[in-house]
């Protein structure tokens, strides 16, 4: 039986899994990614078919937050929405730069 070793194991090969894996690797960890299918296949990211909720076309941070809160029907964690609104443009650009879109 083959034994695989890594500092960090990431379960899931969608955008979130790859973001975690790349971030860990950039921090110097030896990383392994495990998914139920090939890279980027069979994931929620794939099923979204590019319909990510991001601040596109110059949408303001406030407008993006309102859109997320509306979609979440008021059940969102406010602090997390604030972080997402502030970070989303740069994180989406990271995914594009890494070829994950």
Feature-to-residue mapping (PLM):
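A short alpha-helix capping/helix-coil boundary motif
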Residues: 1, 21, 69-72
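Beta1/beta-strand and adjacent pyrophosphate-binding region of the FAD-binding site
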Residues: 2-16, 32
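Short glycine/serine/threonine-rich phosphate/pyrophosphate-binding segments
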Residues: 16-20, 42
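Aromatic pocket-lining residues of Rossmann-like dinucleotide-binding sites
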Residues: 24
């Amino acid at each position: 039986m083959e034994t695989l070793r890594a500092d960090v194991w990431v379960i899931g090969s969608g955008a979130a899994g790859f973001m975690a894996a790349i971030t860990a690797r950039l921090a110097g960890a030896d990383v392994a990614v495990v998914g139920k299918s090939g890279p980027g296949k069979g994931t929620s990211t794939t099923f979204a078919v590019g319909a990510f909720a991001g601040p596109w076309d110059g949408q303001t941070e406030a407008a993006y937050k309102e859109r997320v809160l509306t979609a979440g029907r008021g059940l969102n964690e406010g602090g997390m929405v604030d972080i997402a609104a502030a970070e989303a443009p740069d994180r989406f650009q990271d995914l594009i730069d890494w070829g994950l879109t």
